[in-house]
Each structure stands twice: as structure tokens, then as C-alpha cells.
Amino acid sequence: MPVVTLTGIPGYTGLRIEIDMVCLFDWLLAGCSSKHDYTNPPWNAKVPVQRAMQWMPISQKAGAAWGVDPQLITAIIAIESGGNPNAVSKSNAIGLMQLKASTSGRDVYRRMGWSGEPTTSELKNPERNISMGAAYLNILETGPLAGIEDPKVLQYALVVSYANGAGALLRTFSSDRKKAISKINDLDADEFLDHVARNHPAPQAPRYIYKLEQALDAM
């Protein structure tokens, strides 16, 4: 490993430091951070997608009802629960599309004109869970993400917002929603992914896009 000697710095005269020149080069370009290595560890989507595909008839029905691509729904099922309708996360996200009753579940209830929030048993019901997941994607697309023009960029924005919230995504562009959407529309899909990898506070955000592409390729 190369050695660098620091001189002219108080307290560091003659100090010899070993550095990884590859990491230094990366840092000079964009910052040396493992946060950007969102493809590791590799994710094999084959089995999760196979399990998620068994729910495709429901996904197609929900997609038609809410104007959401059923393949996107299937990909989210594969990523979120691996096709397990009884999955419950540590943060109490429930079911095939891992919905939280108090957040996304409540938002869907409000869209439907209902009070309260869905029960655990309701969220474990495959048809109800997928229907509410599709409804939530519609809420994101027609609400905070409205105005995104590129279909692929919109797809990426949807899954990042689904996983980590639309506000967190938009704030990486601007605190003003309209300005954020305008900046997003200046990017193609690859540029959007690069922006998310470099600027989103959640390391899992770019990895979700990576998993989305793996899942879509496995269908």
C-alpha cells in the first residue's frame, strides 16, 4: 500500500500514513463512502419473484383499479416480503407489501374516506394488502410525486418514496416540492439513481432501486 509523508502540518511533521489510493481517488471524485456501494451484497431475486408471482392475479386487479403497473406491485412484494403474506417487520410493517397501519395504511383509509386504520388481520389478507399497497402507490404518484415526466424516473421515485417517504426524497433536491420535481425532470433514470446514491440519507434507498431492477429482470 502506498505511503504518504505529511509535512508542514503542526503535530504531523514527518508522519507517514498508509492510504488506499483507490479509495483516495474515489474520495476525490465523489467521497469515499461505502454508502454508495448499494449492489453489495448481491441480491438474487429469482426465488422471491417466483413467490410473489403467485399473487399476480390480485396484483393485476389492484393495478387496474389504481392505475399501477402490476409488475411494479409484484417487484415490491418480492423485495418487501418475499411473497409471504404473514411477514411482520421489526417496525411492524405487515403483509405482502409491508404496510404500516399507522402511516401508509392510515393514508389509504383517508383516501377511501374511512376513519381509523387497517387491522393486523386485514393487512395479512393478501387481497386487502395488495389493494392498499397499490392505493398507496397511487397516492404517491398523484400527490407528492405528481409531475415527474420520465416513466422510469417515476418508477424509481415511487419505490424510494414507498420505502423511505416522499419527503425524504424530494428534500434531496429542494425544500420546495415544485422545484424538486423540476430538478428531477432534468435527470434521466441513471442520473436519478446516481443522485439518490449520493444524496439520500437512507443507504437502503439506492439499494431498493437496484433490487427493483433485479426483480423486474427475474420476471
UniProtKB/Swiss-Prot annotation:
Q: GO terms for CC?
A: cell outer membrane
Q: What is its EC number?
A: 4.2.2.n2
**One GO molecular function term?**
lytic endotransglycosylase activity
What keywords are annotated for this sequence in UniProt?
Cell wall biogenesis/degradation, Lyase
Stored InterPro entries: EmtA, Lysozyme-like_dom_sf, Transglyc_AS, Transglycosylase_SLT_dom_1
One GO biological-process annotation of the entry reads: peptidoglycan metabolic process
Q: Which reaction does it catalyse?
A: Endolytic cleavage of the (1->4)-beta-glycosidic linkage between N-acetylmuramic acid (MurNAc) and N-acetylglucosamine (GlcNAc) residues in peptidoglycan with concomitant formation of a 1,6-anhydrobond in the MurNAc residue
- What Pfam families does the database record attribute to this sequence? SLT
Q: Which HAMAP family match?
A: EmtA
Family under the similarity heading: Belongs to the transglycosylase Slt family.
> What function does this protein fulfil?
Murein-degrading enzyme. May play a role in recycling of muropeptides during cell elongation and/or cell division (Potential).
- The protein in question is named Endo-type membrane-bound lytic murein transglycosylase A-like protein
Biological source species: Shigella flexneri
